[in-house]
Every structure is written in structure tokens, then in C-alpha cells.
UniProtKB/Swiss-Prot annotation:
High-affinity cyclic-di-GMP binding protein that regulates type IV pili (T4P) elongation. Required for T4P-mediated surface attachment and walking motility during the early phases of surface colonization. Not required for twitching motility. Does not bind related nucleotides such as GMP, GDP, GTP or ATP. Its main location: cytoplasm. Residues 568-607 are annotated as: Disordered. Contains a PilZ-like fold that binds two molecules of c-di-GMP via two well-conserved c-di-GMP-binding motifs, RXXXR and D/NXSXXG. A motif (D/NXSXXG motif) lies at residues 435-440. It is found in: Cytoplasm. Changing residue 324 to A: 5.6-fold decrease in c-di-GMP affinity. It comes from the Bacteria. Monomer in the absence of c-di-GMP. Forms dimers in the presence of c-di-GMP. Residues 323-492 are annotated as: PilZ-like domain. This is Cyclic-di-GMP receptor FimW. Keywords: c-di-GMP, Cytoplasm, Nucleotide-binding, Virulence. A motif (RXXXR motif) lies at residues 324-328.
Amino acid sequence: MENQSPHLSLRVPTPTQQNLSFCDATPKDIKYWLAHLPKANLGETARQLYQGLIELNQLVLPVEARLQLLELFRPEVHFVCAHLERHFLNQAIVLDERPRKIANLCQALQNHLAIGYKLIVVQEAPRNSRDRAQLFAVGIQRAIRSLCGPLIRASQLYCPVPEGLWLELHQLYQLASQRGVHRLAVRDELAKHTPGLSVEQAYLIPLLLGCARCNQMRQNNIARLAEVLEPWSQLLSIQSATLPGSLFIAVPQIDGPPRYRSLYPETQLASALGIDTQPLVELIREYLLQPEAERAKARLPLIEGVTLDLLQHLSSAWGDIAERTFQRTQGQGQLTLCIGMSALHYFLAGRRPFNEVLQIQEAPEAPRFKADVQDAWAGAFDAQKVTDWQPGMPLEEIEYRPHQSPRSVQPGHPQAHAQADATEDYPTYALPIVNHSPGGYCLSWPKEVPAQLQAGELVGLQDLPGQAWSIAVVRWIRQVRNGGTQMGIEMIAPAAQPCGLQLLRKTEQSSHYLRALLLPAIAAISRPATVITPRLPFQEGSRVQINLHGEERRAVLNRRQASTGSFSQFEYRSAEPVNTPSDKPVTAPVARPPAGEEDFDSLWKSL
């Protein structure tokens, strides 16, 4: 049964048991039991830890003894959860039953660990003894750190945070603050990038996560952020919500993360906690402005895996208040959506494969023959009348399939199978519109969500069949309680030209052609022409070759306008064009010319 202290909103059981079923309740016996868990069998280890924690939380124990035993369990729970993550991270957004159960098991393990530390807090809270201040601080810090695990995992899975979790985090910090132990140093062996964390620093980690717009981030970036917040939490402090610098405030009576101060009435500020993120944002922006060679000397503490894209996102999320440019309108109807650069390129190109997009689009003039001319060899033994010759048929190709619109292909035609295969590779989805604005849409996934869907992914949108495809990006994803999965789509451009893009290198061989999209300039809003490229290998200053329907021209990529984990968008300027012989089509690298021609082709560019 759960007990809620009259002065505390911490959910804990009332211990009633005198013994453990699996060993004696001594540090020596618990240590031996933990050391002999079947670590090679992760499932069995998790089961025994789960049952062991439940029993431990029902056991009547003095505070010091409980803390000793929990400290032995803590690294084992951390080990199991870290190794179980591969079963549910980097999967489809909506998990199948097995990975969902594994994720729930990790949540339960860390929740039961947190319950153990909350029992210490509840037992110690009435004593108010200075001699036991350090023990009280350790109990609160460990409870906050244990609750942080389910919060990070919910963010990574785009799920709602467990009910009551934010309330308990706020309550734990307030208890520490009231006793004056919130800034006591607490050693923490599980902290990866600092020897210890005070209660205030431990509390700042979930607060900063809560206002970092994690639903716009990818799972690996959320994990890196949670790590780097350990050293970053030392750069900030909790202050009064009434101070001018408090951009975000947390209201302890509200079960939710910090929000912009301007969203709360003045009457709620008196009891609220404020966060001034400006010192951290200034360090991030200072790092971003430094030349690459000098970033190692920057004042901002960093860890491996924190990318420039992540820093730019955090600079925006923790910077000045973001205001919605357009008002949302409740939507109705559906949109057709495709996911990823390859699919969008394919549909923009009229369902043509990439190698065809790179060829010169010509309608060869059909040769004219006189039917009444007598062939001197017509009577030869091996002469056979050609009945299936097609005008403009390339003589070096064995088979030629004229391009036809998918609508014109009969179901029994051999090409119907090829087009069916291509469509299976690039599926489309009809999604209901939740709401919309001139800047984008909120769409709902009523059924299974494809594994490819991630925040920052490029998508194509089509209003009606046969209409042009618009270019957009997935800005955020969330799972709604009893409401499936929703995502926010931001429009990039109403149209684009599919093309091939090749990175030109001076000292090595140039890259193969990769899919890219050309977006025209819009003079009315002073927007220059841009190109959307894959995330790698292109960067600012890269010299590239653009292949548009077989016509090649060179360009230089200038300022990067946008970047996600899937694509980059660059401004570009034309460089010296490369003239393509009109009698020789340009094809993708997979379509190899004869050996002699290939050797000469590589020679022309090096002369």
C-alpha cells in the first residue's frame, strides 16, 4: 500500500516486512547476492533485481542501513537499464509489444530504486538535525537522479512523462532547499563527467531537459544532452522567479516542466522557481562563433557526440522566448506523405529512378525507312524481319523499356511489376490533419508508425493525387495519451527540382552523384536559391557539380541555412560550368560505359 505523507507529496510504501526472501539484509550478503546474478542472462538479472527492490522497499530498516543497501543495488540497476536500451531505442516510434515491455521494465526498475531513496527522505524529513544533513542530501540527490532515468527515457520515446514525476522532483528540491542542503557536494560514482552533483545540480538536469524541446530532437541527441548537462549544471543556479533574468520558471504545485515566465500570471511567481539560462546560452553561442581550430580552447565544457546541430538547437530552445508565427486552425481531411530524401526525390522526378534523372532528356528523331526498297540480303538464311524495334532504341542496350506513367501501365504488363517494386520501396501514407497553419501541419498517425520517421527527417506532402509534392521537415514527434502518435511538420518549399549532386575534390576522386533538391529563389521575400543535400559529405565552402537532367554545372555551397540529422540546406552560387557533349548522355555512376571510354573520361578532368 502506498503512503503519502501529509507534508510530502512523495509516493512511498509503508514497510512491514522483517526479512528478505533471497538473502539476509546485510551489506555483505547483498553484495554476494548481486555479484552472483547471472549477468550473461540479462532478462533473469533484471527479474531478480526487480523483485529484490520490491522486497527491499517493504523491509523495515534504519535509514543508514537502507542507504547502504540501495547504494549496492544502484550500479546494478544502471548496468541492466543501459544494456536493455538497445531493444527499444533506434526502433520505430511506436514500439511493438516486446520492446515496449522492456522499456517499461527499465522504467519500473529505476522507479523502484527511486522509491527506496524516497523512503529515506520521508524518514529523515521530520528529524531536521544538522548532524544528518549530509545523509539527507544524499537521499534527495539519489532520488532525483533515479527519477531522471524515466524522464530521459520518456523523452527518447516521445511518450508522456509518468504522472506525478515532475511533482516529486519539485518536492524533493524544495525539501533540500528548506533544510539548506541543496548546495552540499554529493559524491556520485554514476556521474560520467563530474565527481559529484549537489541536489541543485541534480535538479537542474531534468529542468533543463524539460525546456530543451526534446520532441524536436533525435534519441541519441537526447542521451548526449542528458550527459553533458552534468558539467553544464554547475554553470547555472536556481533563483527566484521574480528576478528579471528568470526566462523559465517551475511552479512546484504543477506536475509539469518549466515554462516561459511570460506564460504565468504574476500571482503564481511568488512561490515559483526561476532559471536564468543566459550564462549557458552565451557560452554555447561563443563556441559556435569561434573558428573550428580554436574551439578546443572554448570555455564551454563538452563531451564526445555533442554536435554543432545540437548546440544550435539548444541555443534556440534556451534563448529568447519563441513565439508562434502563425495561428493554428483545426484541420480536416488528409494529406499524402512520403518520408526521406530518396522517396521525395523519386516522386518529384515523376517516379523515375535516380540514374534516369541524371540522363539528358531527349526525344530522338525516329529514322525513316522506305518500305518499298528491296534488301539484297532479304533472302539470306539467317535474315528475320524485325517486328519489335522501337524508334530511338540505343543500340548498345540489350533491353529497352519505354518510360510510361504508372497510370498507363496495364496490370499484366511486365513493367507493372517493376513499378510496384519501386512503389513498395518508397511507400506513401494518407494521414489525417489535426490542425494547420501557413507554416505547417500537425498530422496524426492512426496506425503503425514507420521506423524511418524521426525528428528532423525530410518529408514530402501532397494535397491531392496528381498534384505537386511540397517539401517539409518533421519538427517534433509526440505520443498522446490514448491518442496515438502526432507529429509537427514545417513547410520548407512548395516545390523543388530533383537533381544529382557530386562533391568535387582536388586531391582525391570526386564522390558519386547523390540525390539533392534545388529550391528556386523567391525575390519577393529576398530568399536566395538553395539546395537540399544529404547530411554528409557536403559542408560550407564545398565545390560541387550539379546534374540536372544530364546537364552538368559547377557551384560552390555558401551559407548553411538549416541542418538536421538527415539533411542540410545551403545557399549556393554558380561557378564555371562544365559543357556536356550533346551526343553523349550523362548517366549515373552505376551505368558504366565501356572500359576505354571510362579511362578517357577520368583523364579529361585531370588535364
